[in-house]
């Protein structure tokens, strides 16, 4: 044993010391030692390296190392075969995160295809896999002195271009979108790069909806806002749909001659209608009290439900400002305003001894606003939501369509007016009068109420119809593509709703990957919800506390402290 110790402590031969060539030796900070591997051989079985040491391969085999700066020569020797010696570097060397990246080059092997770049290129993004020396060290191959990744080769051209261009991400045309998305996640380019990629590919950013902080408020919000959350929520949605349908039916039926209020439609009511209304059982509505009218009673009940639903949702919503800016909530407000205006007008007429309190035209416009209640059905209809999302995403194309139609209408209405100017039987008395004909012709409707009679006018009409077909056909494929995207996103089981509740903890970036895994591994049915609560807790432990929303159970990870449980919450549901 003493002989072996003396052999290990003996200095190496001078000839070997002169042949040594110092390799790159980045050292880790914090007082940790850096070990230099001088051979291809793996460490002996049972030998483990300390967790705070970084292994850096040397350039030469079976040769001792001479430290830069005149350090003492290493101690130890090599047996016959491969040598497996490690040596702590002097503490004066730079740390791993502070190494000089200017002139050094690195070789990256992607499934047999080698790429060579400079370390300073990778160091531009230290938060990524290739930019962080500690993260990429696990993929280092000491036999070939290169980094090896068994990944998609065509995708790495774009990944390396991301570093070379300073953050520009472009998908190769021969790489599918899903594969390139996985490569972005593997190389840990970050959420910003993923968002840029999705925007360039035409994906819309998924809307994140916050949940209320209080449990009772959250339960009420889910009950009235998300019908799939529980059985009672579906029941409330059914009641709301029935009330909307009843309100629309009443709005239509009260315009029939048998039920029409004569004082509201004096100009449009014929003598036959008066006679029919007089012979009907409800023909005396004009003389009867409006408060006892059956239509008014049913309308009042519908308005009571609409008002109750709107107030409950307003007080339970997580953000009053966001709630007030939502277009669907504005429609709810517009749907109930005409009732209160009509009620106030009726009361004013009673106090004024039957004198008309408001212009009849204004009153009709106010009552017409009631028809917007039909848009309340979109809250409970996926088809209407898809249509609304399609129109919203296609606003640019629709704007171009309207602009093209406007140019065509001006052009062809002017042309047909001058072409028909010499014919006294022509119906085109002016250019604005020809606007209607141009719109009807370009949209290929062709009512026939106005038509050219001269040869020149017919030629203009033919060109107008052809131009209309071409103009309308140009933006239609883009609109159809948007519709297909939203339709398949709804029907292929992708994420339907995403609600985020951000508490005091701000660890958003660390939790994004776990949320994506939970979304991809989700096996929930349409009526089930999974609540993932993350933050300053142990994610691997997952102690669960169920919270009920009707007939569905949501699991909440707690840390023996319910107040600190909710930091980031997302609810996922599959169709």
UniProtKB/Swiss-Prot annotation:
Residues 482-575 are annotated as: Interaction with KCNE4. Glycans are attached at residue 279. N-glycosylation promotes the cell surface expression. Phosphorylation on Tyr-499 inhibits its channel activity. A lipid is attached at residue 317 (S-palmitoyl cysteine). A motif (Selectivity filter) lies at residues 444-449. GO terms for cellular component: axon; membrane; perinuclear region of cytoplasm; plasma membrane; voltage-gated potassium channel complex. The modification Phosphotyrosine is found at residue 499. GO terms for biological process: action potential; potassium ion transmembrane transport; potassium ion transport; protein homooligomerization. Residues 1-234, 317-327, 382-397, 482-575 are cytoplasmic. Residues 254-294, 349-362, 418-458 are extracellular. This is Potassium voltage-gated channel subfamily A member 3.
């Amino acid at each position: 044993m003493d002989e072996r110790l003396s052999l290990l402590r003996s200095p190496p031969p001078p000839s070997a010391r002169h042949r040594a060539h110092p390799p790159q030796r980045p050292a880790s900070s914090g007082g940790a030692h850096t070990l230099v591997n001088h051979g291809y051989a793996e460490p002996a079985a049972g030998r483990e390296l300390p967790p705070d040491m970084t292994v850096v391969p040397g350039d030469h085999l079976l040769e001792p190392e001479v430290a830069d700066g005149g350090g003492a020569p290493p101690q130890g020797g090599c047996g016959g075969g491969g040598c497996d010696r490690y040596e702590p570097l002097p503490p004066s060397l730079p740390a791993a995160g502070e190494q000089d990246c200017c002139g050094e080059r690195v070789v990256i092997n992607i499934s047999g295809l080698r790429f060579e770049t400079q370390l300073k290129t990778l160091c531009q993004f230290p938060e990524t896999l290739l930019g962080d020396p500690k993260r990429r060290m696990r993929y280092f191959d000491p036999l070939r002195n290169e980094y090896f990744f068994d990944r998609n080769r065509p995708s790495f051209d774009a990944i390396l271009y991301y570093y070379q261009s300073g953050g520009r991400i472009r998908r190769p045309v021969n790489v599918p979108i899903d594969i390139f998305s996985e490569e972005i996640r593997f190389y840990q380019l970050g959420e910003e790069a993923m968002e840029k990629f999705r925007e360039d590919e035409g994906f819309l950013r998924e809307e994140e909806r916050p949940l209320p902080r209080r449990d009772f408020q959250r339960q009420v919000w889910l009950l009235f806002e998300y019908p799939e959350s529980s059985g009672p929520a579906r029941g409330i949605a059914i009641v709301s749909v029935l009330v909307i349908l009843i309100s629309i039916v009443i709005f239509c039926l009260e315009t029939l001659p048998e039920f029409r209020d004569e004082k509201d439609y004096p100009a449009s009511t014929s003598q036959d209608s008066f006679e029919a209304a007089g012979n009907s059982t409800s023909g005396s509505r004009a003389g009867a009290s409006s408060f006892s009218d059956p239509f008014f009673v049913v309308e009042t009940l519908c308005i009571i439900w609409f008002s109750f639903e709107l107030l409950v949702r307003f007080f339970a919503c997580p953000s009053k400002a966001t709630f007030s800016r939502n277009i669907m909530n504005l429609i709810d407000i517009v749907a109930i305003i005409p009732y209160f205006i009509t009620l106030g007008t009726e009361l004013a007429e009673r106090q004024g001894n039957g004198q008309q309190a408001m212009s009849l035209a204004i009153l009709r416009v106010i009552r017409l606003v009631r028809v917007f209640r039909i848009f309340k059905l979109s809250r409970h209809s996926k088809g209407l939501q898809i249509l609304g999302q399609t129109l919203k995403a296609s606003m640019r194309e629709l704007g171009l369509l309207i602009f093209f139609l406007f140019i065509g209408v001006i052009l062809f209405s002017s042309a047909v007016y001058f072409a028909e100017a010499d014919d006294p039987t022509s119906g085109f008395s002016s250019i604005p009068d020809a606007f209607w004909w141009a719109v009807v012709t370009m949209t290929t409707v062709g009512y026939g109420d106005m038509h050219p009679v001269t040869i020149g006018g017919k030629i203009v009409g033919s060109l107008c119809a052809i131009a209309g077909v071409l103009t309308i056909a140009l933006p239609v494929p883009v609109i159809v593509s948007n519709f297909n995207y939203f339709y398949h996103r709804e029907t292929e089981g992708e994420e339907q709703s995403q609600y985020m509740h951000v508490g005091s903890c701000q660890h958003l970036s660390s939790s994004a990957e776990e949320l994506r895994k939970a979304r991809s591994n989700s096996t929930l049915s349409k009526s089930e919800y999974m609540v993932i609560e993350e933050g300053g807790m142990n994610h691997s432990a997952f102690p669960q506390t169920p919270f009920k929303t009707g007939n569905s159970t949501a699991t909440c990870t707690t840390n023996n402290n319910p107040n600190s449980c909710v930091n980031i919450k997302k609810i996922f549901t599959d169709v």
